[in-house]
């Protein structure tokens, strides 16, 4: 009788539903950034990156993003800039080949979902908050993410490049992920 009571109690307690795990569709996804150089805007993208995404808009506490970026895969369309960014003044890929972002939580600001997490870049860990737009699509979904980081917080752009009148202090991060359920 006692076993039956324990079983009934266990069944009566609602289980916390896990977020849906998604697989990134790389060919239809982008991870990019924009900044300014001498007042002119420029855009860039990373060609190699991975993302483990678990998301449930109704239960944000069960959601998680884990993104790793191969920094040497950066492309901006400008040869001089593309040659400089992996170097020691900027990403220093010889010492720090990857950047890593992992969420620590999610919250809502009105209708906007915000992913809070830690970004590790050049060996420096800083909190970063990103706006999230998740749209179910058929069996999968799209996930758009946007936010701003201060490059000097991570030591990106040293020496003459630390001057924010040459290279702007703020770098906008943007990503569009096409996701399929696992």
Model-found features: residue ranges?
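Bacterial N-terminal signal peptides
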Residues: 5-15
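Low-complexity, acidic/polar, glycine-enriched regions of mature
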Residues: 18-182
